[in-house]
A protein has these predicted regions:
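Conserved alpha-helical substructure of the radical SAM core
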Residues: 2-127
Length: 129
């Protein structure tokens, strides 16, 4: 008898094989902002708020991310990684997260964990990634 991990692996393999044959993207990454509250030497995404404000390129807005997400979902994207910098520093993180979950994405969050407080835990329990 299969355990849950074996069953999940078989389902994942099936999805990837089927998507690959049809040239459907299953995985995507949204790098919300280069801002991070840590300065890890091994990481290339670690700008301060000041560095971002003096940067000459505008940040992607919530509406722009939502439009990208709608297009990606229409193409078959299923798994979406939210990353940064530190994604919880992005001002509209929770609005975007909520919308992505309701669009049907399976969301993962790449975070250093330093900003996960009781409120974040409550929100993640309400709408699990």
């Amino acid at each position: 008898m299969e355990d849950g991990n074996e069953s999940n692996a078989r389902i994942t393999d099936f999805l990837f094989n089927k998507a690959s044959g049809r040239k459907i993207p299953l995985n995507g990454t949204f790098e919300l902002s280069p801002e991070c509250n840590f300065a890890c030497r091994m990481c290339y995404v670690r700008k301060t708020r000041r560095e971002i404000l003096t940067h000459d390129r505008p940040m992607v807005t919530l509406e722009q991310w939502l439009e990208i997400a709608r297009q990606a979902r229409a193409q078959g994207l299923l798994y979406l990684l939210l990353t940064g910098g530190e994604p919880f520093l992005w001002p509209d993180f929770w609005k975007l997260y909520d919308a992505l979950i309701h669009m049907g994405f399976l969301v993962s969050i790449n975070t250093n964990g330093s900003l996960i407080d009781d409120e974040a835990i409550r929100k993640l329990q309400e709408l699990p990634p």
